[in-house]
Amino acid sequence: STKAYSTQLAVIYMIVLYMAEQLHNISEQELQAYIEELQRLPEFVAACLTDKETIQYFASKYFNAKDMYFIGRNVDYAASLEASLKLKEISYIHSEAYTAGELKHGPISLIEDGTLVIAICTYDKLFDKMMSNVKEVKARGAVVLGITTQQKKEAVSQEADYSFCVPKISDFMLPSLSIIPLQLFA
């Protein structure tokens, strides 16, 4: 369920922060900033829901799709896995999640004209590589929905057919937000 997934992520974040503190891998100031961000997650989730019409439009347009693929890198790949599972469970649509860096090793051959690909592009460090993957699937005829942060919206909008923005928070916490529009979509 959505609540279980979100709760699991929050607990993982707390464990990671605790371990980082215990191992002295994080300053007190950084720790407090992460804790404040974690406490504000409900506010950030609410911000994701203000533009749910975009996702509802996309869902209504492609509700009878036969196949759908989710791609992402690093933490975005983890969100892709959860989104694919949700789509299968709720909509009974065949979907798969792939790490975008592995597309050339087989999965790209599944993409044909009109195939739906949801690209989660929130992780800053691998953003340029992710955009390269979006171009690859577009070249094969995919229809792409890009999930990104407001800071990257323009770049994603230039490549994807549709885009949806989530608030920018720490990279490792972004799956808590990028999953929201995808759960609405499912």
Regions found by a protein language model. Give the residues of each.
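A SIS-like phosphosugar-recognition module
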Residues: S1-A186
